């Protein structure tokens, strides 16, 4: 885990001077260069960091090896050693590719530190593992990604962690759900898959109000899954959130080649999160960190600018099609939460950036009819479309379509889906870099044949 731009571990003097020199450069430029002259790794003047290919590292002496192990001591209280540069011992403890990536991710989200993991779910699990214990309670928004829902409902009860589900846009319901044992307010925005927007500042204000009456040890934290937006479109830490989690597999990687996850948060969280990762696993391999570092993050801004423009055109087409009952995309004037979206979803140039994912529902009088039509449409696209691929994931350079009710959110029962606002006929569409006319052509073909 890296603590750039700030951190507890003392590195050499280059990062401090570099931070001062780069502060006047655009954030999009810093996605490419990150932290130049990083002390994490002297890679002999390569313009592009090479792929680190070793699982273990040669040590010059037992003394140096001992010092390295002290830095990764067994308790957080012991983990207070200061050094000028990392001592790499073993990939699970630290490795240069992922540490450089962590520096750059912290810059991208404008956070104090970042820790990468094998997947987004590994990052979510680690954050909860660090913040929560037996008897802790989570209050979560009632619609979440299906695997997060599964983690909260199937696994946390085994550890005596209670989860209360509530609509985070209902202020009174949220207040009623909070108890003295609540340690975490957890939500996504935009919400997967419904594209609902949660007011980040209001949730932060609720947490701060309660924390004013609590001791430090009983503090309640806020965490946002920012996967749909990516740091290009939204940076929740700027609104006062404690932690951001993201799946690197999605928009940040962008090419659908590598999995990863990240926690970005305050400086003090460095020690416990890295120690948790050391003991529980979930370390991001160098072979996955490297492509995200050299291809994914540097190209995020240019990819998303184009993909957002295409998403707007596709959303407008669907909104005007007679076969479609509902389209939810923050970039549409008809989107009921657009004022809030415009406040939160701003790119590095302070332009409204509503993302690359939309949600739509085919017309049907009953949930069953809409479900049937959605499955038919998606199945037609799976075999007949050139520009749209039936696949989970999102943020890819290729346009991806999926049916949440039977795929990503199938861990939630049909009855619960309806209660939580997930339409059985809802279709999630993640727009890629194809020409908008080609995507629309394939959608027209599917709508004409099936609906």
Regions found by a protein language model. Give the residues of each.
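N-terminal glycine-rich, Lys/His-bearing helix-loop that initiates the first secondary-structure elements
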Residues: 1-81
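Short, flexible, solvent-exposed loop/turn segments with mixed acidic/basic and small polar residues
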Residues: 129-130, 154, 338-351, 415-422
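Conserved PLP-enzyme active-site core in the AAT-like
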Residues: 5-23, 28, 35-42, 113-323, ...
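Active-site C-terminal subdomain of aminotransferase-like
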Residues: 33-37, 60, 65-66, 71-87, ...
């Amino acid at each position: 885990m890296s603590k750039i731009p700030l951190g507890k571990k003392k590195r050499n003097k280059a990062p401090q001077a570099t931070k001062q020199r780069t502060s006047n450069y655009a954030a999009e430029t810093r996605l490419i260069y990150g932290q130049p002259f990083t002390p994490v790794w002297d890679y002999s003047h390569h313009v592009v960091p090479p792929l680190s290919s070793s699982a273990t590292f040669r040590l010059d002496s037992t003394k140096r090896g001992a010092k390295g192990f002290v830095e990764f001591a067994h308790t957080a209280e012991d983990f207070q050693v200061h050094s000028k540069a990392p001592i790499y011992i073993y990939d699970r403890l630290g490795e240069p590719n992922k540490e450089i990536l962590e520096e750059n991710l912290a810059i991208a989200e404008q956070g104090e530190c970042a820790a990468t993991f094998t997947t987004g779910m590994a990052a979510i699990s680690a954050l909860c593992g660090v913040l929560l214990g037996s008897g802790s309670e989570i209050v979560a928004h009632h619609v979440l990604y299906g695997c997060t829902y599964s983690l909260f409902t199937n696994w946390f009860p085994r550890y005596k962690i209670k989860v209360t589900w509530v609509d985070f846009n209902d202020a009174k319901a949220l207040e009623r759900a909070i108890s003295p044992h609540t340690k975490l307010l957890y939500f996504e925005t935009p919400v997967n898959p419904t594209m609902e927007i949660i007011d980040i500042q209001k949730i932060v204000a609720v947490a701060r109000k309660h924390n004013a009456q609590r001791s430090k040890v009983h503090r309640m934290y806020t965490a946002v899954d920012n996967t749909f937006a990516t740091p290009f479109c939204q940076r929740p830490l700027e609104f006062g959130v404690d932690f951001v989690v993201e799946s690197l597999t999605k928009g940040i990687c962008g090419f659908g080649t590598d999995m990863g996850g990240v926690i970005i948060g305050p400086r003090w969280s460095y020690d416990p999160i890295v120690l948790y990762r050391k003991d529980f696993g979930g370390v991001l391999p160098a072979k996955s960190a490297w492509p995200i570092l050299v291809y994914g993050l540097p190209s995020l801004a240019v990819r998303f600018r184009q993909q957002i423009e295409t998403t707007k055109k596709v959303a407008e087409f669907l909104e005007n099609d007679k076969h479609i009952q509902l389209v939810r995309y923050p970039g549409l004037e008809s989107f009921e939460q657009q004022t809030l979206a415009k406040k939160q979803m701003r790119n590095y140039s302070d332009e409204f950036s509503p993302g690359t994912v939309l949600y739509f529902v085919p017309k049907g009088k009953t949930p069953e009819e809409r479900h049937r039509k959605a499955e038919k449409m998606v199945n037609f696209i799976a075999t007949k479309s050139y520009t749209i691929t039936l696949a989970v994931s999102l943020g890819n350079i290729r346009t991806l379509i999926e049916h949440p009710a039977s795929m990503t959110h199938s861990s939630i029962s049909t009855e619960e889906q309806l209660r939580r606002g997930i339409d059985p006929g809802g279709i999630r569409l993640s727009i890629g870099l194809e020409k908008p006319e080609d995507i629309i052509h394939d959608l027209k073909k599917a709508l004409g044949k099936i609906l």
